[in-house]
Amino acid sequence: MAFQAQDLDMIGKKDLLKVNGGVSAQTVFYSAQGLPARRDPFYWVVNANLTLNFMGISAPFSASFSSQESQFAQPFNQYGISPKYKAITAHIGWRSLNYSELTMAGMQFLGAGVEVEPKDIPIYVSALYGRFTKAIDPLNIPETAGSMPAYERWGMAAKIGYKPKFGQLNLTMFRGFENPASVTYTDPSLEVTPGANLTIGVNGKVKITRTTNLKFEYAHSIYTHNLNLEPSALDDFTYADNLGSLIPANA
């Protein structure tokens, strides 16, 4: 279920109440030959949406329900809300934000975020924190999920942007990390270890003509394969040792 942006600043400027929506349903038949079945041979999915607009406050609701929910390794039924007041938009619950293609590229997360975009100045900021995937314990994997064991994954991201008339410039950062304590046991042969990643990027565009824009993007990523290893110095990449708690450096 999802609640999208509601502009509280528009109260009294619209009709009192407007309602619209729709419902759709589908059934799926599944079969596999030569490999184990990854789901039931028959399942259904129902999608519904309802939009309420009360005195300028828009509250779009959407929901997806499936007979497979109890067998998915990751959540299928999800919900969230994104209320908006003037230049500030808050995001709570299951949300998806897109900062850039190389850092925070529209990944869904369960948590909280905020966007601030004033109308009178060309600067805007955004930040988020939340859980991106829940843990999949190797001792409790659904038989039809077709999933590998995985650690619980959390992340935080931030963006600051400048948008003059001739273009746009964004500085972005994403830090993701997996919780080593979220999985009780892993088979060494699977090579599943808790990792961490830090990505810092810059992107933007420059207006060349009325119909032509030059877009650019650059990002640099540092990845720690196993958080269970002891920290160590990296002589060839000394800048990584100065990033503090953002990314642990080890062999």
What is each residue range found by the language model?
Residues M1-D7:
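Bacterial Sec-dependent N-terminal signal peptides
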Residues D7-A251:
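Outer-membrane beta-barrel channel domains
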